Amino acid sequence: MDASSSPSPSEESLKLELDDLQKQLNKKLRFEASVCSIHNLLRDHYSSSSPSLRKQFYIVVSRVATVLKTRYTATGFWVAGLSLFEEAERLVSDASEKKHLKSCVAQAKEQLSEVDNQPTESSQGYLFEGHLTVDREPPQPQWLVQQNLMSAFASIVGGESSNGPTENTIGETANLMQELINGLDMIIPDILDDGGPPRAPPASKEVVEKLPVIIFTEELLKKFGAEAECCICKENLVIGDKMQELPCKHTFHPPCLKPWLDEHNSCPICRHELPTDDQKYENWKEREKEAEEERKGAENAVRGGEYMYV
């Protein structure tokens, strides 16, 4: 039998392969090859796939977009991502999926356009992340700049104490002091930001607007009991009350829930989080989730004896 007549892989095996490729996206050295493999599978099998497999394709492609935005920003990665997003946008028919993929395409093009528009000098640095080059060195981190300024300041002050101040040393000292102050203004906000998890912003306005509203019926009254109440206003629920339902299935009066979600992004009862409009916070959550998965993987590996040394 020739290759052209060989049977196509079953949907089950395709799902397993997509699962494995999605995991490979977390490994930087495997990212680009994984994206290319996902692209090939999408091109060859999406049109004949079942709705559930099509959904899995969409989830994996969306994961590629998330990883590009939050972790791997090298130009080559974005080029591979753009090709995948364009193929996916061409194939999908669901309106919301197509809209999201269009935004992924636009963001990839914007990212690559920014790289193209950078001054020629900047292209003489690193060919890719981690590459060692003999061209100009990257800028020093701010902490090292401050350390060098402190050393210079201490040297000048030491010279003044032994030889007495001169007009030149007084001027140099004043200049160094000003540079130190300016540098601290740049460092302190970063220190404060890194001191712990960021404060959770309000829930996304679009998500809140789409929360379903249900009517409290006699059947629900029997289910929850006569003492059922809105936990925000503490009023007992009565038949006919309009209730807004969160993804965690907890319900509240819409006028009670709105002020809460204007300031928080979580359920008042179980703290299940809703998406927010703050991309920086969403990126932080994504990194925390990945870090937690890596910690669990390491713990499981140690328990399983994968990293035992003799």
UniProtKB/Swiss-Prot annotation:
Disruption phenotype: Hypersensitivity to abscisic acid (ABA).
Posttranslational mods: Auto-ubiquitinated.
GO cellular component: cytosol; nucleus
Domain of life: Eukaryota
CDD domains the record matches: RING-H2_RNF126-like
UniProt keywords, alphabetically: Abscisic acid signaling pathway, Coiled coil, Cytoplasm, Metal-binding, Nucleus, Transferase, Ubl conjugation, Ubl conjugation pathway, Zinc, Zinc-finger
Biased composition range(s): Basic and acidic residues: 285-298
Chain segments annotated as coiled-coil in the UniProt record: 276-306
EC category: transferase
Ranges where the record places region Disordered: 285-310
Effect of residue 231 to S: Loss of E3 ubiquitin ligase activity
A single GO molecular function term of this UniProt record: ubiquitin-protein transferase activity
Localization terms from the record: Nucleus; Cytoplasm
Record function comment: E3 ubiquitin-protein ligase that acts as a negative regulator of abscisic acid (ABA) signaling. Mediates ubiquitination and subsequent proteasomal degradation of the transcription factor ABI3.
Protein name, as recorded: E3 ubiquitin-protein ligase AIP2
Lineage, opening ranks: Eukaryota, Viridiplantae, Streptophyta, Embryophyta, Tracheophyta
